[in-house]
Swiss-Prot record:
It comes from Arabidopsis thaliana (Mouse-ear cress). This is UDP-glycosyltransferase 71B1. The gene is UGT71B1. It catalyses: a flavonol + UDP-alpha-D-glucose = a flavonol 3-O-beta-D-glucoside + UDP + H(+). Belongs to the UDP-glycosyltransferase family. It holds the Pfam family UDPGT.
Amino acid sequence: MKVELVFIPSPGVGHIRATTALAKLLVASDNRLSVTLIVIPSRVSDDASSSVYTNSEDRLRYILLPARDQTTDLVSYIDSQKPQVRAVVSKVAGDVSTRSDSRLAGIVVDMFCTSMIDIADEFNLSAYIFYTSNASYLGLQFHVQSLYDEKELDVSEFKDTEMKFDVPTLTQPFPAKCLPSVMLNKKWFPYVLGRARSFRATKGILVNSVADMEPQALSFFSGGNGNTNIPPVYAVGPIMDLESSGDEEKRKEILHWLKEQPTKSVVFLCFGSMGGFSEEQAREIAVALERSGHRFLWSLRRASPVGNKSNPPPGEFTNLEEILPKGFLDRTVEIGKIISWAPQVDVLNSPAIGAFVTHCGWNSILESLWFGVPMAAWPIYAEQQFNAFHMVDELGLAAEVKKEYRRDFLVEEPEIVTADEIERGIKCAMEQDSKMRKRVMEMKDKLHVALVDGGSSNCALKKFVQDVVDNVP
């Protein structure tokens, strides 16, 4: 019997790339499987994401939905797509029903698209989650929901406290100041609870992580700590799109510059597709870079206004000489390069890169570890504060810039991270013979081994496919 899955990624380049990479892995792992990937258009113009789904392939096809009103918040925007998604699923189900040897086996929805689970129920299909973050954070979501539903404990009341609490998927006490903004906000907290409850109602959760990277979390999910009412969790990572994309001329120029730099001599600063800073913060970064004495490749963009629910992407600074310290560009011309867009995978793969100052998006963390590059953690939004704690305190794979920093639509006025804090994080991450660098190299090996035939993630992927077949109604 042949089976087909429908994938629904969240809009945005990171989620679409990860979902596409997972879909490709699945169809390559089993000839019985086909995937239809329904692409919800990004709320912002994003050429990088459109390049992912330009061509359908054998047993993998893309259906791009027409754009809708893009001025609302992400949750409302995704919900507005349900009628279009329902129509596509109906057509796919109809097409599959005409083939006697095929069955529509289920829908795999992104962790932010849980409202689409209703569509699976309407068509009597199994629903699965693709959790594009880590297993430890998934455990935090379940734990926060359990605290509220079973003990009437609301973690949003921990805002602005120094409180720490135990999370079953972590070995270290977790500081409330590193909770994501949505968990600390009374308005958004019910949404957090609803998502966790929705996760429990599915047949399984695919997590973009590796068993050897998060043994505490995977032990918890396997039932080792008596947890109940959680579906099977499959650690199938690292799921990454390592293909080059974007402006080819800029890419060549950047890589040519890197080739001229000594091995492990360059600190790379890049903060994701939505990462930008104010003029004042950019000046602090510049001061820190110059003081550190290290060569640098800095992806610098201007932050969008705070408090905007539509969350527009960062823009460009029109005149760097006006916003950076006087003479900075002249003094660092031989050791530094400032860019707007960065071919991140290619840069991290360069022998010249010694450390990565990152916003701690999960894709960026996995890419950094895949190439064996130590990190300096500077989170900005979403679950990145948790990820920073996870990398710095739990696993010792990153130095800290400021792990509780945040700049998102719920923050009225972001604080300024000082040059001293930035310099300290850079110097620590760039240290050549550190224990942290050794741990990063060990983790690199674990990530690579997980994907080979017989590796933990390879086995988890095969187990998922078999469970999908077994769950066909």
